[in-house]
Amino acid sequence: VRPHRTYFGEKDAQQLRVVRRMAEEQRLPVEIVGLPTLREPDGLAMSSRNAYLTLEERRAALVLPRALELARTIVECEGVRDADRLKEALADCIRREPRARIDYVAVTDYETLEELATINRPALLLLAVRIGSTRLIDNTTLAPNRSP
C-alpha cells in the first residue's frame, strides 16, 4: 500500500515535525497532514493516558490547559518575548498544583523545534507534566506578531 496522505495529531507536535522532516528528507511521495488537538470540554487534551488519572488527578491535570492559556496571554497580549521569563511564569503556574511535576517546559521555533531565547517568530510552547504517575503532554502555538 502506498498512501498519498498520512494524518498525525498536533498534540504530539515533536512527532509531527520529525515525521514531516523525515518524509521530506527521504523524498517520500506522501503528504503529512497535522490535525488539531482534540480537547475535552474543560480544555484538557484528549489522550488515552487520561484514563489512568484518578478524579483528583484529572482535576489537577487542568493545570496544563491553564498554563497554555497563560502563555498565550503573556506573549500575545502582554508582549513578552523573553522565553526564559515565559517559562518561569509557566513553571510557577504549574508548581502551584501539588500533584503536578514538570518534566519540561520548552519554547521552540514552530517548524524546526530549535529552542528559542527570544520569541520573535511563530513558536511552539511544549509542556510535559506528570500528574501522579501519568505523564501528559500538550502544546500551543505562540504568535508574537499579535500586538497587545
Predicted features, each with a name:
Residues 10-11, 129:
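Fold-independent oxyanion-binding glycine-rich loops
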Residues 9-10, 137:
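Active-site flanking residues adjacent to catalytic metal/cofactor-binding acidic residues
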Residues 88-148:
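Phosphate/ribose-recognition catalytic cores of enzymes acting on nucleotide-derived substrates
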Residues 1-7:
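Divalent-metal (Mg2+/Mn2+/Ca2+)-assisted nucleotide/phosphate chemistry catalytic cores
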Residues 5, 12-103, 108:
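Glycine-rich, Lys/Arg-enriched anion-binding loops that position phosphate/diphosphate groups
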